[in-house]
Amino acid sequence: MIKGYKEKVKIHDGHGYVYKFDNGFGASVVKHSGSYGSEKGLYEIAVLDSDGDLCYSTPITDDVIGYANEDKVLDTLHRIKSL
């Protein structure tokens, strides 16, 4: 499992999780009717900066990551935690 602060949130008609890591980065993992992949039961991931805002300037991605299965979510969370 990923160590770091995690908060479950209700978002639109679905749910999400906000992660915060010791390196100052975090992640938003969501599944709702407007997220990329929700129609297939998949997640959308965003990298967050230390203020909790979307961060588009990491080696991981310059956008959100859609259509992520659970393995992709876990891999991406590990990568964010290791930045």
Language-model segments: residues:
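Catalytic phosphate/metal-binding cores of nucleic-acid and nucleotide-processing enzymes, i.e., regions
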Residues: M1-L83
